[in-house]
């Protein structure tokens, strides 16, 4: 068939709008689409069962469990000290927040007092972790919407934070640096200069990110008015973190239920009004600026405090210092028994909640008086926030679903645990 004949044949075929199908008139058809679990936009092994009318989302059902590791059950077979390393593996983008929530709960059970130097160091490190986590969110969110430059810039600054974590703990992500009663070891001498260098450049880098996105017409087109939720629905669905604050609710545990002395720091709780993807973006960008401010205050406090204890002096909880272990057989025996048998909190339960980068993270521990927890449960913000996805997605295009997932910033290790 010649080109001319092919064109003539194609022109003779009626357009789809001219084809009548009487049997289907008035019948609404929908399609069920499986999105994931292996899909880059789901930010992990998340499967979404999406019902579509054309390209419009009628409903969506998250299907979770592909990354279940049984961390809560595994912790029941570990002593309280050894369980710290497992908390890193839930929200692997903010492991220090998980460490903090867990050790605060155990310290409540024990009635343990933590040295001021350790408390201030905890605040400084979790705020650096918040910035690092938000940088991953920003880079991947922008990449999902085809803004690749922001992804590269964000990971440039995140690398600097991970270098600080490596300097402090020897690990870049799974730090396991917080201990029941304080810190694993003291901050190194180089820590002050490394943090100061990062804080000096970070405000300007946030300006760069905002210059690329905030007034970008394509970014605005893909985010403004998409996935909006009001405060009443957000509260009913248990939404916390930037998602809740984007609806106008100034709920931040660092202010409303302060821990680690957050009530003594000066910072604002960023909020917005429309509750859409764009507002969630604005809230997180403002949060990074507030975290920089908190880090500056904490760094100055560390300078004012100077060298001092970084671990509780209660020998029933903390091992003897290494200087004693090398000189005293009794200290060596005590160290051995503490790490092999563990300490035994009194019977009871304790709950400790912190404001993680994704929202309200809580650890609930039940003690039966033994050296191992009877039950550990995490209130994971990613798990709770994910249930708001169907509410936000209905009526939007399937392409908007990609942006919606990114705006919730879920971590599947925390969802499935």
Swiss-Prot record:
Gene3D superfamilies: Cytochrome-c3 Hydrogenase, chain B. Keywords: Cell membrane, Membrane, NAD, Quinone, Translocase, Transport, Ubiquinone. Its EC number is 7.1.1.-. It catalyses: a quinone + NADH + 5 H(+)(in) = a quinol + NAD(+) + 4 H(+)(out). GO terms for molecular function: NAD binding; NADH:ubiquinone reductase (non-electrogenic) activity; quinone binding. The keyword NAD applies. It is a peripheral membrane protein. InterPro entries: NADH_Q_OxRdtase_suD (IPR001135), NADH_UbQ_OxRdtase_49kDa_CS (IPR014029), NDH1_su_D/H (IPR022885), NiFe-Hase_large (IPR029014). It is an enzyme of class 7 (translocase). GO terms for cellular component: plasma membrane. It is found in: Cell membrane. The keyword Ribonucleoprotein does not apply. Belongs to the complex I 49 kDa subunit family. NDH-1 shuttles electrons from NADH, via FMN and iron-sulfur (Fe-S) centers, to quinones in the respiratory chain. The immediate electron acceptor for the enzyme in this species is believed to be ubiquinone. Couples the redox reaction to proton translocation (for every two electrons transferred, four hydrogen ions are translocated across the cytoplasmic membrane), and thus conserves the redox energy in a proton gradient. NDH-1 is composed of 14 different subunits. Subunits NuoB, C, D, E, F, and G constitute the peripheral sector of the complex. This is NADH-quinone oxidoreductase subunit D 1.
């Amino acid at each position: 068939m010649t080109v001319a004949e092919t064109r003539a044949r194609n022109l003779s075929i009626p357009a789809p709008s001219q084809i009548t199908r009487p049997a289907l008139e008035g019948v609404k058809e929908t399609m069920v689409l499986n999105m994931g679990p292996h899909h880059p936009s789901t930010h992990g092994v998340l499967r979404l069962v999406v019902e579509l009318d054309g390209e419009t989302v009628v409903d969506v059902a998250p299907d979770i469990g592909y990354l279940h590791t049984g961390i809560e059950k595994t912790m029941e077979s570990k002593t309280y000290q050894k369980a710290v390393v497992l908390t890193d593996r839930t929200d692997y983008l903010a492991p220090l927040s998980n460490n903090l929530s867990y050790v605060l709960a155990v310290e409540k059970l024990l009635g343990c007092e933590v040295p001021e130097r350790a408390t201030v160091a905890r605040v400084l490190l979790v705020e650096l972790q918040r910035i690092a986590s938000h940088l991953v969110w920003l880079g991947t969110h922008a990449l999902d919407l085809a803004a690749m430059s922001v992804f590269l810039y964000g990971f440039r600054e995140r690398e600097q934070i991970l270098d600080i974590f490596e300097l402090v703990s020897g690990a870049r992500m799974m730090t396991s640096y917080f201990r029941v009663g304080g810190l694993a070891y003291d901050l190194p001498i180089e820590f002050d200069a490394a943090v100061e260098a990062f804080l000096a450049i970070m405000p300007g880098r946030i300006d760069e990110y905002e210059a690329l996105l905030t007034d970008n017409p394509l970014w605005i087109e893909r985010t403004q008015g998409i996935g909006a939720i009001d405060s009443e629905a957000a509260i009913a669905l248990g939404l916390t973190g930037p998602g809740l604050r984007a609806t106008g609710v100034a709920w931040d545990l660092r202010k409303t239920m302060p821990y680690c002395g957050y009530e003594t720091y000066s910072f604002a709780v960023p909020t917005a009004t429309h509750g859409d993807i764009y507002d969630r973006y604005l809230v997180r960008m403002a949060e990074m600026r507030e975290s920089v401010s908190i880090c500056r205050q904490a760094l100055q406090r560390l300078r004012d405090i100077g060298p001092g204890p970084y671990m509780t002096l209660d020998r029933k909880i903390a091992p003897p210092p290494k200087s004693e272990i090398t000189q005293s057989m009794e200290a060596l025996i005590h160290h051995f028994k503490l790490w092999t048998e563990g300490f035994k909190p009194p019977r009871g339960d304790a709950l400790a909640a912190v404001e993680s980068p994704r929202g309200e993270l809580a650890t609930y521990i039940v003690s039966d008086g033994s050296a191992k927890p009877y039950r550990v449960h995490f209130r994971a913000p990613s798990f709770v926030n994910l249930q708001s996805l169907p509410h936000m997605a209905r009526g939007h295009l399937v392409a908007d679903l990609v942006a919606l997932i990114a705006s919730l910033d879920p971590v599947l290790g925390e969802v499935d645990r």
